Swiss-Prot record:
UniProt propeptide residues: 24-25
Gene Ontology cellular component terms for the protein in this record: extracellular region; nematocyst
Keyword list, A-Z: Cleavage on pair of basic residues, Disulfide bond, Nematocyst, Neurotoxin, Secreted, Signal, Toxin
Description of post-translational modifications: Contains 4 disulfide bonds.
Signal peptide (residue range): 1-23
Species classification: Eukaryota, Metazoa, Cnidaria, Anthozoa, Hexacorallia
Any one GO MF annotation of this record: toxin activity
Location of this chain's protein in the cell: Secreted; Nematocyst
Function statement: Induces neurotoxic symptoms on zebrafish. Has also been claimed to be implied in calcification, but tests on homolog proteins suggest that proteins of this family have a neurotoxic function and not a calcification function.
Name of the protein in its database record: Small cysteine-rich protein 4
Superkingdom, natural source: Eukaryota
Family, per entry: Belongs to the Cnidaria small cysteine-rich protein (SCRiP) family. beta subfamily.
Length: 81
């Protein structure tokens, strides 16, 4: 019985450790975005617009280095070429 309890506690501890690591990574990404470390927000002006992910209209190309506020949106940049 003691072995089962010990195993259960180890499983719970492992799950909490993984959950903490994932949420910590999300906080680090948010912090990096706020300070310009990874990528910057799509401007939503004439040259950069947020559209549904993977659906840039004619004259625009996908700009993966910029992000929109929603995971279902992607930034599209005016394609000058």
């Amino acid at each position: 019985m003691d072995t089962k309890v010990a195993c259960l506690l180890l499983i719970i501890l492992g799950a909490l450790t993984v959950q903490g690591a994932v949420s910590g990574n999300k906080r680090m990404n948010l912090h990096a975005r706020q300070w310009g470390g990874i990528e910057r927000e799509c401007m939503n002006n004439g040259e950069e617009q947020c559209f549904p992910m993977g659906q840039c209209p004619g004259g625009f190309r996908e700009c993966s280095e910029y992000y929109c506020g929603s995971p279902s949106l992607g930034c599209c940049c005016w394609d000058e070429w």
